Amino acid sequence: MVTTGRRVCRSAGLFALCYAAGTFVGPLYAAINENAAARGTSPAVAAASDLKFALDEIVAGFSRDTGIAVRVTYGSSGNFARQIAQGAPYELFLSADESFVMQLADRGLTLDRGTLYAIGRIALYAPNESPLVPDPRLQDLTRRVRDGSSGRIAIANPEHAPYGRAAEQALRSVGLWDAIAPRLVLGENVAQAAQFAASGNADGGIIAYSLALAPPLRERGRFALLPESLHAPLRQRMALTVRASPGAQRLYEYLQLPAARAILERHGFALPED
C-alpha cells in the first residue's frame, strides 16, 4: 500500500524544507489573501517546491535591488494550477511542469504562455544512517527491494507533483515500480518527500536534485544524480497571471536576467537555451 508519511521537522536545519513542504503553512491563501493595494506592492508568487532554496536567494536579491517585498508560497505545481483556476490570487506562477502553465493559458488565466526558465533533474537521496547506497542506475535500491531488505522510499505524489511523476517514470524505467509501490511514502510535494527522507521517515527518496544539493539535505545524507534518460524532461515554465501587478512583472523580468539564471544553475537546474 502506498502511504503518506508523517510530517516531522526534528532539527533547525530542516525548518526551511519543512516550510516549503507545507508543514508550517497556515490556512489556504492565508499569506496572500490581503487587500488589492497590498497585492500591488508585494506580489504573491506560487512556486514549485523544488525551487525553495534557489528562489529564496533570487527573491532576496530582487528585494534588495528594487525595494519590493515578495510573498512566495511553495507547493506542488498541480495543486497550484487548480487553485489559480479556482481564483487564488497569485500573480506569478513558477511551475515544475510547463503543461500546467499551458493549461492555464488556454483558459485565459495567464497573460501569455510564459517562458521556460529551467530544466529540473532528480536524484536518489539517502540519509547518512540509511543502509541504502545511492547510485545512478538504482542498482542498490533494486537489490534491496527484491531481497526484502529495503525500507520505505519517499517520492512526491505523482498525481499532481511533476517530480513525483518523474520519480515514477525512473522506477518504471528500471523495472522496479510494481515491486516498490507497496513501500512508497508519498509527499504532498517534492519538498515534503525530501523532508521524509532526510528526517529518517524513509530509507531514502527520489527527490529534486536542487533539494539534494541544499545544505540541510547535503549535510545529512548522500545522493546520486539520475540519468535524464530515465524520465521525461522536467521542463519548468513560469507565467504571469491575469492578476499580475507591476511588481510581479518586474520579478518576472528579473528571473530572466543572467544573475538569476546563474543562481538557478548553481542550485542544480539546467538552463534552457535562449
Place the predicted regions along the sequence by residue.
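Bacterial N-terminal signal peptides
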Residues: 12-27
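Intrinsically disordered, low-complexity linker/propeptide segments enriched in Ser/Thr/Gly/Pro
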Residues: 8-9, 25, 32
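Intrinsically disordered, metal-sensing/regulatory segments
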Residues: 8-9, 13, 166
